[in-house]
């Protein structure tokens, strides 16, 4: 499975390289800016479609709170409560894939927000209960992403820092802390 993932990555990279080769100068510039993560590419005409898809994804993720809490106690426990754990996992993959895809499509790949924010919420709330974690993660993610975007504009006129240059400054220390804590 790992090798298949690597091969899909190589094929995708090849397609992107070909598209960049045949693209106009403006197209390549747009792609590079998108690749650095940028909220500036989202216009008001994109917002209704973006919000509709994100709202559906958030609603679907909120439906997963009870099954996720059951899974915290183990797959056998969740199955004894009547949950189909394989279906829950597949549903979770589809919902997170949808939310990640729509955000990446509009804003580019923004590193560390999705990786660090759930851990930040868990550390602040000191709970594993998804009834609290999911809403707080959604709000914390939006707040941290907007804070990082604000930091990007601090240099002043014409000096906008790419979003992916700021998010690792917050996300990487959190991930390192979580990894060190789990080892110790």
Regions inferred by a protein language model and the residue ranges of each:
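Alpha-helical transmembrane segments in inner-membrane proteins
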Residues: 1-184
């Amino acid at each position: 499975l790992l090798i298949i993932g690597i091969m899909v990555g190589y094929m995708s990279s090849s397609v992107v390289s070909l598209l960049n080769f045949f693209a106009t100068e403006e197209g390549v510039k747009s792609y590079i800016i998108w690749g650095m993560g940028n909220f500036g590419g989202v216009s008001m005409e994109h917002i209704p479609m973006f919000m509709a898809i994100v709202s559906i994804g958030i609603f679907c993720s909120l439906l997963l709170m009870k099954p996720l809490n059951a899974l915290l106690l183990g797959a056998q426990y969740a199955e004894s409560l009547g949950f189909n754990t394989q279906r829950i996992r597949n549903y979770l993959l589809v919902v997170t894939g949808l939310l990640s895809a729509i955000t990446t499509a509009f804003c580019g790949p923004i590193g560390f927000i999705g990786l660090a924010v759930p851990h930040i919420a868990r550390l602040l709330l000191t709970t594993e209960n998804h009834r609290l974690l999911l809403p707080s993660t959604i709000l914390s993610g939006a707040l941290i992403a907007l804070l990082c975007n604000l930091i990007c504009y601090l240099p002043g006129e014409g000096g906008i820092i790419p979003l992916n240059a700021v998010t690792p400054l917050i996300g990487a220390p959190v991930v390192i802390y979580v990894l060190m804590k789990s080892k110790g």
